[in-house]
């Protein structure tokens, strides 16, 4: 079956437009991917957000002087659509030679266009470089599982059957791995990321979690769907009292994508990690 992104700019030669062009945004419905996971808009078992950070954001003042900022865009996890990443980049590049009366005027335009594209209200922040620099590089709490010894014999498809837990021992902990990798479903390009699991419930075997995450290595899907699949597989296994799954992906084309799915309505930390 043809992937819905096949008609997007992904994998194609594109003209870079330098004047404001909102029509460049290419929405992709979440419905088909939800259906693959047995979900619908009415039955989502999680809350969450997709945080996009843009490091190549620039526009002009009315006097023609360039301005730069770092953009932070928060797309609700239950929005009808996502935005294809290359089209997002092309849209943001179209601002480069466009004049706006103020930073707030641009923020309002971005919020209007992005909300229209995804079909839900999008949070938009335009942050100064000094503000972001003061935050520094984020360090994850919890336990890194990357040094555990595991044997791996398959990389093509996620393997939830690898996951194990101790139903007789209830814990509250955070586990993370920097070894998450999947591939773009259209171009095959690698997507590198860090995956954080925060939960309260039956003790998850960390080696089994690592083996499971490595099984995504040749899997082709968008960032958002990978995180949703991981969330659902862990929820089915653990039946936890609390669960959140957060991926911090390495940037491409000046954008990084950070999907967060949780049983609770909690705003995730958006400080960038060392590879971002």
UniProtKB/Swiss-Prot annotation:
Residues bound to substrate: 83-85, 223-224
Top-level taxon: Bacteria
Stored InterPro entries: GTP-CH-I_C/QueF (IPR043133), NADPH_dep_7-cyano-7-deazaG_red (IPR050084), QueF (IPR029500), QueF_N (IPR029139), QueF_type2 (IPR016428)
Location within or outside the cell: Cytoplasm
Gene Ontology, cellular component aspect: cytosol
Active-site feature positions: 184 (thioimide intermediate), 191 (proton donor)
Primary location recorded for the protein, binned into one broad class: cytoplasm
Single GO molecular function: preQ1 synthase activity
Catalytic reaction list: 7-aminomethyl-7-carbaguanine + 2 NADP(+) = 7-cyano-7-deazaguanine + 2 NADPH + 3 H(+)
Binding site for NADPH: 85-86, 252-253
Listed Pfam families: QueF, QueF_N
SUPFAM superfamilies referenced in this protein's UniProt entry, alphabetically: Tetrahydrobiopterin biosynthesis enzymes-like
Biological-process GO terms, alphabetical: queuosine biosynthetic process; tRNA modification
Transmembrane portions of the chain: none
Keyword tags: Cytoplasm, NADP, Oxidoreductase, Queuosine biosynthesis
Quaternary structure and interacting proteins, as annotated: Homodimer.
Similarity comment: family membership: Belongs to the GTP cyclohydrolase I family. QueF type 2 subfamily.
Known function: Catalyzes the NADPH-dependent reduction of 7-cyano-7-deazaguanine (preQ0) to 7-aminomethyl-7-deazaguanine (preQ1).
UniProt-recorded name of the protein: NADPH-dependent 7-cyano-7-deazaguanine reductase
Organism: Pseudomonas aeruginosa (strain ATCC 15692 / DSM 22644 / CIP 104116 / JCM 14847 / LMG 12228 / 1C / PRS 101 / PAO1)
The organism's taxonomic lineage, starting at the top: Bacteria, Pseudomonadati, Pseudomonadota, Gammaproteobacteria, Pseudomonadales
